[in-house]
């Protein structure tokens, strides 16, 4: 038999401890918690966007975000992984072109101070540098999930950030669900 090493064992935070910490937070944070709790019931949790101050530290394959924005598309394609590079070299499908038109239109409206939502079913669109800064609503089969695009998303697919399945948390089996409960009288 092996002996367990003696020493302090760090305790994992319990649900009660996290609830107490959440209760101690200011009221503004409580409103955010409420919306994320509602989102959790619907199967997704809103990601926290990365502040724009940290975007200056971003590099993609050695290029800064500003260099990526100025780069022509054919040079940017050479930086992508093989799967994404092959997809873009074949050309964009009509749904991809429509999405890019919507994005350009939304950026033009954002420059004027207005905002229009960009909704799409096109989950296989590769995130390009011109999409950065927008929140794109991606369809997951049930609802549209808001995906705030930051430089760290470049080169990934939109569908990676809008999960289509929920984690199933099974309850207890009901009456007659197992052989041991077949002969129990129903109330």
UniProtKB/Swiss-Prot annotation:
<dbReference type="GO" id="GO:0006412">
    <property type="term" value="P:translation"/>
</dbReference>
<dbReference type="Pfam" id="PF00203">
    <property type="entry name" value="Ribosomal_S19"/>
</dbReference>
<dbReference type="InterPro" id="IPR005713">
    <property type="entry name" value="Ribosomal_uS19_euk/arc"/>
</dbReference>
<keyword id="KW-0687">Ribonucleoprotein</keyword>
<dbReference type="InterPro" id="IPR023575">
    <property type="entry name" value="Ribosomal_uS19_SF"/>
</dbReference>
<feature type="compositionally biased region" description="Low complexity">
    <location>
        <begin position="14"/>
        <end position="30"/>
    </location>
</feature>
<keyword id="KW-0689">Ribosomal protein</keyword>
<dbReference type="GO" id="GO:0019843">
    <property type="term" value="F:rRNA binding"/>
</dbReference>
<dbReference type="GO" id="GO:0000028">
    <property type="term" value="P:ribosomal small subunit assembly"/>
</dbReference>
<dbReference type="InterPro" id="IPR020934">
    <property type="entry name" value="Ribosomal_uS19_CS"/>
</dbReference>
<dbReference type="GO" id="GO:0003735">
    <property type="term" value="F:structural constituent of ribosome"/>
</dbReference>
<feature type="compositionally biased region" description="Basic and acidic residues">
    <location>
        <begin position="1"/>
        <end position="13"/>
    </location>
</feature>
<keyword id="KW-0694">RNA-binding</keyword>
<feature type="region of interest" description="Disordered">
    <location>
        <begin position="1"/>
        <end position="45"/>
    </location>
</feature>
<keyword id="KW-0699">rRNA-binding</keyword>
<protein>
    <recommendedName>
        <fullName>Small ribosomal subunit protein uS19</fullName>
    </recommendedName>
</protein>
<dbReference type="InterPro" id="IPR002222">
    <property type="entry name" value="Ribosomal_uS19"/>
</dbReference>
<comment type="function">
    <text>Protein S19 forms a complex with S13 that binds strongly to the 16S ribosomal RNA.</text>
</comment>
<dbReference type="GO" id="GO:0022627">
    <property type="term" value="C:cytosolic small ribosomal subunit"/>
</dbReference>
<comment type="similarity">
    <text>Belongs to the universal ribosomal protein uS19 family.</text>
</comment>
């Amino acid at each position: 038999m092996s002996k367990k090493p003696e020493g302090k064992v760090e305790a994992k935070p319990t649900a009660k401890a996290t609830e107490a910490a959440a209760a101690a937070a200011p009221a503004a944070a409580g409103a955010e918690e409420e919306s994320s709790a509602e989102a959790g019931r619907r199967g997704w949790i809103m990601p926290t966007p990365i502040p724009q101050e940290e975007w200056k530290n971003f590099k993609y394959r050695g290029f800064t975000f500003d260099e990526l924005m100025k780069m022509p598309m054919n040079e940017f394609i050479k930086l992508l992984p093989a799967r994404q590079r092959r997809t873009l070299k074949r050309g964009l499908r009509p749904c991809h072109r429509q999405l890019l038109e919507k994005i350009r239109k939304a950026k033009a409206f954002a420059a004027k101070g207005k905002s229009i939502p960009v909704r799409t079913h096109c989950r296989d669109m590769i995130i390009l540098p011109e999409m950065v800064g927008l929140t794109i609503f991606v369809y997951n089969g049930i609802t549209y999930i808001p995906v705030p695009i930051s430089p760290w998303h470049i080169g990934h697919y939109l569908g990676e950030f809008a999960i289509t399945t929920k984690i199933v948390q099974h309850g207890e089996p009901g009456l007659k669900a197992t052989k041991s409960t077949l002969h129990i009288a129903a109330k």
